[in-house]
């Protein structure tokens, strides 16, 4: 009687390009939560359930919202999905451009601080430098640096700064909480 040995099934190993389970959970909770809040706020505004926000008519505010809102779920997807392939690279380039336009358009949003820059504008140079560092490290093959920088950009530049957007005096806070 012959028998074939059964292969031992080992759990899949994390590749060096993937996030740890704790980091994946943090990104999912923070990014998913803020994306859901943004979707509810936009839905309330679109249905006329939220108060009017005249500042949305300003070009800088409209451009900023138009780039930040798709960057939230796209960044979440990029951090959680398989990395390194052509799909990841293409969507990563789109995300970098969205973030760059969002950061630069934030320079034109100063009506809440009487025409002056506020503390939230410190995210602008940090985001631009972080984007440059992330792209340069990916092109150089420094994937660990690329990964760390992208996580910091998403959690700090998008989630951290995005949390300020839901303050009561800001547009997203007004739309979400009324």
Predicted segment positions?
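Alpha-helical membrane insertion/targeting regions
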Residues: 2-178
């Amino acid at each position: 009687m012959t028998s074939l040995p059964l292969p031992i099934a080992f759990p899949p190993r994390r590749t060096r390009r993937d996030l740890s389970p704790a980091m994946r959970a943090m990104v999912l909770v923070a990014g998913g939560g803020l994306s859901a809040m943004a979707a509810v706020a936009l839905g309330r505004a679109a249905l006329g359930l939220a108060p009017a926000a005249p500042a949305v008519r300003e070009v800088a505010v409209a451009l900023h919202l138009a780039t930040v809102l798709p960057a939230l779920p796209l960044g979440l997807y990029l951090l959680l999905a398989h990395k390194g392939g052509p799909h990841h690279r293409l969507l990563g380039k789109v995300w970098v451009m969205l973030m760059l336009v969002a950061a630069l358009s934030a320079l034109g949003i100063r009506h809440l601080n009487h025409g002056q820059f506020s503390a939230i504008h410190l995210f602008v140079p940090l985001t631009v430098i972080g984007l440059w560092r992330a792209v340069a490290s990916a092109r150089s093959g420094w994937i660990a640096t690329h990964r760390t920088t992208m996580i910091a950009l998403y959690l700090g530049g998008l989630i951290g700064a995005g949390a300020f957007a839901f303050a009561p005096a800001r547009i997203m806070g007004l739309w979400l909480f009324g």
